[in-house]
Structure formats: structure tokens, C-alpha cells
Amino acid sequence: MSRRQFTSRLRSLVRRLRLAPRSVVAAVRDRLERVAVAARAVVAAGRDRPERVVAAVLALAVGGLVYYLAIDLFPYHSVNDDEGVYLYQAAMLLEGKLFLRPGDIPWEAVRPWFFVVDEVGGEVRMYSKYSPVAPAVFAIGRLLGDWNIALGLVAAATAGGVYLLGSAAFDRRVGLLAVPILAGSPLFLLTSATFFSYAPATMLNVAFAAAYVRAARTGSRRWGAAAGTAVGVAFFCRPYTAVLFALPFIGHTLASLDVAWRRSGWSPGFRGVLGRSLAIALPGAAFVGVTLAYNAVVTGDPFLFPYAAFAPNDGIGFGTREILNYEREYTPALAADVTERIVEYFFTEWVAAGLLGTALAAVGVLAALWRERGRSGPGAIARFDPAAGMGSGEVAAVLFAVLPSVFLGEAYFWGTHNGLRNGLIDLLGPFYHFDALVPVAVFGAAGVAFLVRGAGSLLRSVTTRRRARIALLVGLVVSAPVVASAEAAVVEGPFAANERRTDSLEATYEPFEDRSFDDALVFTPDPYGDWQAHPFQYLRSGGGYDGDVVYATDGSPERDLAVLAATNRTAYRFTYRGDWTGAYFPVNSELRRLRVLEGESVRATTTVGVPAAASSTSVRVETPEGYARYSVPDAARTNDTVRVEWTIGPDAARAENLVYEGGSRFRDVPLADGGAEVDLVVTFVGVGGSSVTYRQEVTIDGDADGGVRAVWPPETRVCRLTTECGYEGTWVGPDGDYVDGVSVAMDARVAS
């Protein structure tokens, strides 16, 4: 085409456009404007992308930090044994089970902590008092190779949601700042690094809030359905917690419907608000139905929650409240006192930087009010347009309303009082108020942004932009140590307290390090009664009683023998010497292989060391049917030890090499019918009446086809000033050391 031809065609096209109908011109103009809008959107997305990448990196870093704390600070879990409940339930879900069925094993020996016992058709089954939602989340970590991975994922997801909420309530920079402020909260770090339902429930609540805001801004029913699903699952996870968090959003929804109806009636605008509200409500209601259906399956009554089946008086409301052996009259006055204490505790010791962080959050609230100063007043309602989307001021107001909803709502629940009483809140923070960290993080970030921007604006008004930036940077550097000091002050205490208990737990579980089991049975102590994994929640049988190891609580001789017979596994006894103080102080633990000796009789030899300054010795053989008392002849004594040779037969037990002095019956102490216990008690008395006692307890079965079965070695304990040695009495001396001269050696054989 020649230059002349091109010029001619261009002129012809221009003439046609001039003569074209206005509609065509308008269409072209509209198309060009759309292209321009799309181009601006692409440019804006390009600008936003770096902040979104930073937000993703921060969220992943938070998840990594929580994962590290889980494996470093809580390798044996915390001293709150509820973790074992959730992990038991998670293991059950991985095996497709809602119930534990002990079969022929006495259920009292293998009942996990906080499990409800139910008997259906003559079969005993047990289920957790907790919802299966959090255990299902934790099971994801196990599927990925490590239970703790789930904790990191939950923390990362929560941090990402807080970024979105901060961005919606203020801007993306506030959203970015909210993530490290959230991660700087001791309550967030410690609770997120443990296997409780609080962090997963908050993750679901934050997902609900973020989806709700998106639905309200875009009118998208899909986002509404996502919000409803999230809050419905949160209700299934922790019903009361979900309701308290959702109340401000429910209020916003009702206000939006009311304003839209009053303003335009059955208009497209009202129908849009109603449609997204129903999109939220219907999935939420559906999961309420799922919750009730789960109740019906496990408790037999859709309105009886497993929580209430375990402890009917352990719930919300005033009046008599009770769980296990603790009962209290929970009154409004007590609730007010507890709430006052927990508010102070929460805002001074468990948020990022303590009082400084609380002050920054207060500044953030003032910043939100300052931003709305021109839009508040009588005309605010008139400007409130639900059909136009949810403004940043509305998001900030709803987030702020979460604070009174949580604190006032939890005042109606006595659990906070119980947590303060038993010391768990001192170690792990006010975990019932975990949701309150979300608005605190967002408003804390807003406070930081407001102060920095205000300082920058002030500096730019009195000096050059470059000098203002330098001065602002210097100010941030100078203030950093103050912030770090405030953060260290709130983190140091609870972290050190939990680290101390982890050190004690490490000593407790030392016998299990680098040890694997195959078809084993391990008897565990019972300092808190017949509960498995309480307090030793690190030792769990898994999702059933057919795995590599079954843990059973040590009990009566009859029950222990029944457990041995029902399991037919290689048996061990895990025990300890010392006073169990909730892992505040360490104990000396021991894991011993058990043998079942069976024959016409069992002949045992026990050699004990003579404590320093001992002046006399007495020996007793005891059974439930009586006792015999013996003196020690010279032949059984050396300068440093006393040797006792004793025999356990099918009908009686006695000391062979000692001199009989008397007792409840005869030299031979009769055995009880069936399973029983034979105790050898050697007591040394010193000057002034001080004493040291050795006590050995042997579980025996005297009905073994005319012979006897004995579980060997016996439980051996040493104590001072009493002959009834418990676990707590086995530390001898002021620092947990035995008195000089104490030692124990034993051996046994079967006589046919």
C-alpha cells in the first residue's frame, strides 16, 4: 500500500466515525473506558502484590515459629493434660473411630482423661468430652508426618486472616503490622503451640470474619456461603466461643437488613443484602445440625453435648458448678471479680509488649474514631448503605465489638475461675479469651501506623522531607529497645515457667527415650486416680488397644492380673521416686520389664542397705488377710545390709531366715482368695524415733492350678517416718537424696 492510499483510507475512516450514530461512538468510548479500568486494576494489583507476598511470608514465619515452639518448648506437651484428650481423639479419627472399645481389658485401667464411659448392649465404649473438629485438624499434621505441623498451619492461617482483617479495617500496611503484633502475644504463641481447640476455633472464626467482610463488600453469595461454613464449623468446634465471636457480625447483619428494608423496601438492594445474609445463615445452620447429629450419635441425645455428659454442671450460667471433685457456687459477684482479674491479666501480661501493646491498641481505637470524625453523628445512619458494601469503619467497629462480646460472654462461664484456681492460666494464659487477640492485634497495628504517620506528617511540616525521614528512622531505632524490653517482660515469665516443667518432664520420660515397643503393655502410676494420660499424657495407646503398646493405669492386684490376661503382651512397669508436683519438680523415673513367675511357690531374696544411725530393725510380711512380724538374727545381717529370704506359696507367704515374733495370725500369713498383694516391709529405727522403711509390693494370684503366679519385680519404695510409702514419700533427705546406706537388691526364682 502506498503512502497516498493509506492517507486516503485513514481520512475515510475518520469521516465514517464522524457520521456514525452516537450509540456507536458511545459503545466505543465505553469499551475504551473498560480497557482503561482493567489496565488500572492490573497496575493496582501489581502495586498490591509485594505487600501480599510480604503478608504470606510473615504468616508462614508465624507458622514456623509456632512449630518450633511446639517441638522445642513443648516436646512432651504442656502440663494441661487436655492435650492428650485431643490427640487420643485425633488418633481415633485417623482409624475411623468415634469410640474406644476396651473389650476384655478392664476399662478402669485404660480410660483416658476426660473420656465418657458408656455401656451399650453389654459393651463398654468410651468417647471424648470434646468435639472432633480440633482433633480432625490435628490429624492433618499426623498425615503430613508430624502432629506439630498442624499447629504451625493453624497459626499461619490465623495470621493470614488477621492480615486480611487489618487491611479491611484500615489498610494493607496496618494488616502487615498486625501479623507480628499477633505473633508477639505470649497467649498466641503458647496456646497455638499446644494441642487445644482454642487456636483452631479462632482460625475458623477469623476465616468467617474475613469471608463475611468480603461478602459484604462484593455482595458475593459464594463468599457468604464460605463465611457461613466457617462459623458453622467453628460452632461444631467450640459452640459458645463461636457464638460470642459471631455476635457483632450478627448485629451488623441485622442492622444492614433493617436499614436496607427501611430505605427501599423489597428493592434489588434489599434483596442483595438478604441473599448474602441467607448465604451465610444457611451453611451455619446446617453445621449446627451436624453438631446436634454428632451429639445424637455419641450421647444418644442431640441436645446433650459430650461436654455435659461428662460433667453436667460444668458449663455456662450461674449456680452450682462442678467438675470431678471440685465444686463452687458461681455467682454474678464472683463472675465480676474473675472478669476484672482476667481483663487486667490479659492486657498487662498476655498481649504483645504488655501495657505498651495495650496502649498502642487504644491509640488504634482512637485513630479509627478520628478517621470517622466527619462521618459520625446524626447523619451516620443516613450514610450507612448496606447495598454499597461494608466500609472500613464498619469493619473496625465490628472487630472492636468482639472485645466486649468475648469478655462479657466468658464472664457467664465459670471455666476462667477454674483455670485461675488450678494454675493453668498462669502457665498458658487466659486461653478462653483467645479470640480477643484478633482485634487487639489489628488495633495495635493501627496505633503504630497512626503514630508513625502522625510523626512523619509533623516532621515534614517543620523540615524537609529527607530530614523528616531520617528523624523518623532515628526515632524508630531509639524506640525499638523500649518495645523489645516490654516484649521480653511479658514473654520471659511464662516461657521460663513452661521451660522448667519441660525439663522436669524430660527427666520423667527419660526411660522412654530411644525405646520402641512391640506388642507391649506398660503399667503407669496413678497420682491423679484411674485416668490414662493424666498426668502422663505423653504416654498414649493411640486410636485403640491393638497397637504396638497399650498403657494401663496401675491398680489393684485383681485388676492388674486381669489386664495382663486380657492383653497377653510383654509387660513393663513405669514408676517414679519422688513427689509428683505437676512437673514443677523433677522425679526419678524407671521403666522395668515385668515377668510373671508361675510355679508351686516363688522364693525371693531381698537385700537392703542399713541406713546410717539405725539402731533396730523389724520386718513384716503383710497380705490383705493379716501380717507376721519378724526380728533379724545375726545370720541375716552384715555391717551394711540385711538379707530377707521369703517365700510366696499358693496359700501363704512367710519369711524363711528370720525369727518369728508375732502377728495377726501365724508365722505363715494367709493369702486372700484370687488376686492379692504380698508386701515385705523392712523398717530401721534410729535414735530419737527417726525411721527409714523399705516396702516391696508383689502382685500375686494364688489360684493358678494349685500353684502361684507372681508379677516380678515388685514395686519398691523407700520412705521416712512412715511405713506406708507412697510415691511422694520415696524422696529421702532434704534435697531428694537417699539417706546414707540405703540400697536395694532383689532376686526371685520359681520352686516346682
Predicted feature locations:
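Start-transfer (signal-anchor) and selected internal transmembrane alpha helices
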Residues: 1-74, 167, 248, 252-260, ...
